[in-house]
Amino acid sequence: MPTVNQLIRKPRQAQVKRNKVPALQENPQKRGVCTRVYTTTPKKPNSALRKVAKIRLTNGFEVIGYIPGEGHNLQEHSVVMIRGGRVKDLPGVRYHIIRGVLDTQGVKNRKQRRSKYGAKRPK
């Protein structure tokens, strides 16, 4: 533990908080264009083909975004909206694509948690 004199000479430094979503630049969402839509495999012990897209944002950042839900209509040059939120078993995927906004369609036949997947209320 430092003495009072040591603290006067060199005060305590505040810990720097690392930003988990730097590409958003403090914004809640950002718009971008898909440059590549592909599938990737998760880390051990999980096994699947997760749908992801490489996205060039309006601020020039190039990020990887996860496409949630079953089935999607995204392809190259699709305009999408992303939000923060990583996918724990996909290294490097720190953003989610928002379903039902811009060129991304909502999930079909979705009955529960519809707002998370951009699905309209069934009649």
UniProtKB/Swiss-Prot annotation:
InterPro entries: NA-bd_OB-fold, Ribosomal_uS12, Ribosomal_uS12_bac. GO terms for molecular function: rRNA binding; structural constituent of ribosome; tRNA binding. Keywords: Methylation, Ribonucleoprotein, Ribosomal protein, RNA-binding, rRNA-binding, tRNA-binding. The modification 3-methylthioaspartic acid is found at D89. GO terms for cellular component: small ribosomal subunit. GO terms for biological process: translation. Belongs to the universal ribosomal protein uS12 family. With S4 and S5 plays an important role in translational accuracy. Part of the 30S ribosomal subunit. Contacts proteins S8 and S17. May interact with IF1 in the 30S initiation complex. This is Small ribosomal subunit protein uS12. It comes from Agrobacterium fabrum (strain C58 / ATCC 33970).
